[in-house]
Amino acid sequence: MKFRCPGALAVGTGFIKDYELLFKGSKTGSYLTIEEKKGSSVPVAIWKVDENHERALDRYEGYPSFYYKKEIEIDFISLKRKLPHRAKAFVYIMHEDRCLGIPSKGYLQVCLEGYKTFGFSCKYLEDALKNSMEVKHGNNNK
């Protein structure tokens, strides 16, 4: 984010409930997305962005052809004061017709670094990768 959106501010962390983390994509690569799944959750960083940041993110994420945006209400803990908050936010979600896939080592490393920066368990990424590997080897029907 600091490279794509200079001036954007990380304000908190939280969880998107009833969604799971997945690696999906196309022939050019597999990337993170979320899909609905009751009982699951996905850790997220909450960023304060302006309209210019949002336009830059739209271009970077391939909106609206690769990802679409969804507005959600999310509970989160502020980074500065560690207080609970609730806010409207937007998330990028890859179109559901994309297939599960295995990300590049470089992309996975960037994701791991982001998770570590915000203190998230890497188990979410490991589970998403395991799910993709099972599909590649025919052990899953997603």
Language model segments and positions:
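Glycine-aromatic micro-motifs
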Residues: 1-142
